[in-house]
Amino acid sequence: MACAGPASGRHGVSMQEHMAIDVSPGPIRPIRLISNYFPHFYPFLEPVLRAPDRQAMLAPAIPSAPQLQPNPEPEGDSDDSTALGTLEFTLLFDEDNSALHCTAHRAKGLKPPAAGSVDTYVKANLLPGASKASQLRTRTVRGTREPVWEETLTYHGFTCQDAGRKTLRLCVCEDSRLRRRRRGPPLGELRVPLRKLVPNRARSFDICLEKRKLTKRPKSLDTARGMSLYEEEEVEAEVFGEERGRILLSLCYSSERGGLLVGVLRCVHLAPMDANGYSDPFVRLFLHPSSGKKSKYKTSVRRKTLNPEFNEEFFYAGHREELAQKALLVSVWDYDLGTADDFIGGVQLSGRASGERLRHWRECLGHCDHRLELWHLLDSVPPQLGD
């Protein structure tokens, strides 16, 4: 049995509808007909929306009380990358001195996991590459979410080839040691492809920090480097090549002393050989073939570092024509107490070398009293002695 429609073209109104009141802003007043606010449905028929009244549409609209709209959240707050804050810094590729300078200025709007103040520092890494070999950091600024560092971090031995293939990663980290907290992930990080840099021209950045994307370190890398306990934290799974590091050597033929001065200045980005992620490096020098004079030297050991500075100089007596027929073998080792030292990398300078190694050797012996400093990439195999 069909339900009868409302008489006189009007819908029936229930007692609940009569008891409704208007809660819009302004004086409280009852609602005469709630159907004017909501569609009216009959209990036994298909829901039918009320047809619009054409005359009411043509009549002038009665202004109603203004409705309060919720304030939309700032656009940046809805994005995780911009909610972590921003970092201001400047990069300068000093091509003449083979150096990359990164000046960390300040951070703004940091969002630490815990309430209150935070102690922060900036950590830098060159990717791809060994994590600790290229890791630099600023000092810690305490008790603020708007830290100002104004500190410059310098990567030595940085070349145009590095600028074309490497990326600089900057992380804003909380120094949990000062507050005896458990070390957590960085507050935010960013990455800058260094191919964008113009040599000898500073460039400033103000970039939003992002969440760090972490994966487990490949076990093959740890095993190959003897690094089974290298890092407990998760690091980037960027498989870098077998780059063993670089060494800065200076050569000068002294006409006054009648011999070759070899300076071992520094090494950078050495391969870690110890379980703690570092090495105890030193450098060995050998002039081959030996003429019975002093031909072997070695530097002192630098403890627990992958970027050692030596600044030590050694002398090989001999005429330029005699030295031109010889080869200088330079090797970097990791010192181990009680066991055999581990080979890190080496380089050979001679008339039979090629590239920068050959140029370094020829220019040194071709010009007296001319000191020439050049960076050399270390080979992963020990230098071979010729006949």
Curated annotation (Swiss-Prot):
<feature type="binding site">
    <location>
        <position position="342"/>
    </location>
    <ligand>
        <name>Ca(2+) 2</name>
    </ligand>
</feature>
<dbReference type="InterPro" id="IPR043566">
    <property type="entry name" value="Rabphilin/DOC2/Noc2"/>
</dbReference>
<dbReference type="InterPro" id="IPR014638">
    <property type="entry name" value="Doc2"/>
</dbReference>
<dbReference type="GO" id="GO:0061669">
    <property type="term" value="P:spontaneous neurotransmitter secretion"/>
</dbReference>
<feature type="domain" description="C2 2">
    <location>
        <begin position="243"/>
        <end position="376"/>
    </location>
</feature>
<dbReference type="InterPro" id="IPR047022">
    <property type="entry name" value="Rabphilin_Doc2_C2A"/>
</dbReference>
<feature type="binding site">
    <location>
        <position position="334"/>
    </location>
    <ligand>
        <name>Ca(2+) 1</name>
    </ligand>
</feature>
<dbReference type="InterPro" id="IPR001565">
    <property type="entry name" value="Synaptotagmin"/>
</dbReference>
<dbReference type="InterPro" id="IPR035892">
    <property type="entry name" value="C2_domain_sf"/>
</dbReference>
<protein>
    <recommendedName>
        <fullName>Double C2-like domain-containing protein gamma</fullName>
    </recommendedName>
</protein>
<feature type="binding site">
    <location>
        <position position="336"/>
    </location>
    <ligand>
        <name>Ca(2+) 2</name>
    </ligand>
</feature>
<feature type="domain" description="C2 1">
    <location>
        <begin position="83"/>
        <end position="209"/>
    </location>
</feature>
<feature type="binding site">
    <location>
        <position position="274"/>
    </location>
    <ligand>
        <name>Ca(2+) 2</name>
    </ligand>
</feature>
<dbReference type="InterPro" id="IPR000008">
    <property type="entry name" value="C2_dom"/>
</dbReference>
<keyword id="KW-0106">Calcium</keyword>
<feature type="binding site">
    <location>
        <position position="334"/>
    </location>
    <ligand>
        <name>Ca(2+) 2</name>
    </ligand>
</feature>
<feature type="binding site">
    <location>
        <position position="274"/>
    </location>
    <ligand>
        <name>Ca(2+) 1</name>
    </ligand>
</feature>
<feature type="binding site">
    <location>
        <position position="280"/>
    </location>
    <ligand>
        <name>Ca(2+) 1</name>
    </ligand>
</feature>
<dbReference type="Pfam" id="PF00168">
    <property type="entry name" value="C2"/>
</dbReference>
<keyword id="KW-0677">Repeat</keyword>
<dbReference type="GO" id="GO:0016020">
    <property type="term" value="C:membrane"/>
</dbReference>
<dbReference type="GO" id="GO:0098793">
    <property type="term" value="C:presynapse"/>
</dbReference>
<comment type="function">
    <text>May be involved in regulation of vesicular trafficking. In vitro, does not bind calcium and phospholipids.</text>
</comment>
<keyword id="KW-0479">Metal-binding</keyword>
<dbReference type="GO" id="GO:0046872">
    <property type="term" value="F:metal ion binding"/>
</dbReference>
<feature type="binding site">
    <location>
        <position position="336"/>
    </location>
    <ligand>
        <name>Ca(2+) 1</name>
    </ligand>
</feature>
